[in-house]
Amino acid sequence: NGCYAYRIEHEGKALVFSTDCEHYEDRPNKNLIKLCQDADALIYDAQYTEDEYHGLNGQFSRKGWGHSTMREGVKVAEAANVDKLILFHHDPSHDDNFIKQIEAESRQLFPQSIAAYEGLQIDLSQNELPKSLFD
């Protein structure tokens, strides 16, 4: 468990990039939450669904593989008071329709979220996220 994460600050804006970030099962990662505190955007490794990660509903478990889930990204974003959540590191087995479903679920939990896609540009000075590729 653990992750690499980077916080980039410039002209009063903050972006956190959290790659290959497997969450703890029993508690939030306090170091990650501290790093993300009040960031304008968090780019979070959301490679798996809950079923895939935990090995439920016919899936095999991906625990210990070094990746996380959208729901864990939402938890971090909420705990750290992040403005925007960008889900990335999509599993290669997930097609666009599958990612669209994950993004829709994420938006129900954290409205300012988007699934990353090639060419996505985020302007931290804007309050709203750009249009989703999956809308």
Q: What spans do the regions from the language model cover?
A:
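Active-site beta-strand termini and strand-to-loop segments that position acidic
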Residues: 7-11
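Short proline/glycine- and acidic-rich turn/helix-capping motifs at secondary-structure junctions
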Residues: 121-123
